[in-house]
A protein has these predicted regions:
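N-terminal glycine-rich FAD/FM-binding segment characteristic of electron-transfer flavoproteins
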Residues: 1-258
Length: 258
């Protein structure tokens, strides 16, 4: 469950919601993993969004995100608790962390998933080949988005995936819900924390994050020109939405990358 500055990211709650759906299909429970410093209080929020258990790895060495100690912490949790499925948000942190963790625990990782289901693999029976049940079927765009691939990891556990923010739904919040909290200490050695953070400089963007927008007014190359985007700006203002655009528009210089 990704947190930044002791606040849960939206993707963390989305993954708890999807994890709850998958756990229901498998007849098991959903467990969230909290990694950081001074973050135990966030367990209650995860419980209210559907987590049955919360594993808390709380250590001063985890106050700021650093690849090595975070990868060590998650790999240790997986080796200790042996989950069937492990989901990570496809954020900047998740894309750095997920592949390193999967390599350490010797399992596969399907990146940037847009859909997760429990089903059979192979999906269509093949004569002479065993069809495995209750597999995680991970769907993601491939070849630049020109096709959709469904991938399974039948031979290794856990089945790991990074999931794009904004594509899964949060579960309905249940105020006052509680989860079993398990405190876990993976043990840190100098090899796990050899990078020292000397200074953190944060820049605050004045551009709205489209992931937080309820209404998007989006345009592509067909809008025709930078001047024509003023129509979309006006429409977004009327609707209370945010303007977004395609990569082609950015490449043409009609809209900034941000």
């Amino acid at each position: 469950a990704q947190q930044v500055d002791n606040e849960l990211s939206g993707i963390a709650l989305e993954l708890v919601g999807k994890g709850k759906d998958l756990a229901k299909d498998l007849g098991t429970e959903v467990t969230a993993v909290l990694v950081g410093s001074g973050i135990k209080g966030l367990a209650d929020e995860l419980a209210e969004y559907g987590a049955d258990k919360v594993i808390v790895v709380d250590d001063p060495e985890l106050k700021e995100y650093r690849t090595e100690p975070y990868a060590h912490a998650l790999a240790s949790v997986i080796n200790e608790f042996k989950p069937e499925i492990f989901l990570v948000g496809a954020t900047a942190i998740g894309r750095d962390l997920g592949p390193r963790v999967s390599a350490r625990i010797h399992t596969g990782l399907t990146a940037d998933c847009t859909q997760l289901d429990i089903g059979d693999f192979p999906i269509n029976p093949i004569p002479g080949k065993e069809q495995l049940h209750n597999q995680l079927l991970m769907t993601r765009p491939a070849f630049g988005g020109n096709t959709i691939a469904t991938i399974a990891c039948p031979n290794f556990r856990p089945q790991m995936a990074t999931v794009r923010p904004g594509v899964m739904q949060k579960a309905e919040r249940v105020p006052g819900a509680k989860a079993e909290v398990i405190e876990f200490n993976p043990g840190f050695t100098p090899d796990n924390k050899y990078v020292e953070i000397l200074k953190i400089v944060k820049s605050v963007s004045d551009v709205a994050d489209i992931m937080d927008a309820k209404i998007l007014v989006s345009g592509g190359r067909g809008v025709g020109s930078a001047e024509n985007f003023k129509l979309l700006d006006d429409l977004a203002e009327v609707l209370g939405g945010t303007v977004s655009c395609s990569r082609a528009v950015v490449d043409a210089g009609w809209k900034p990358k941000d």
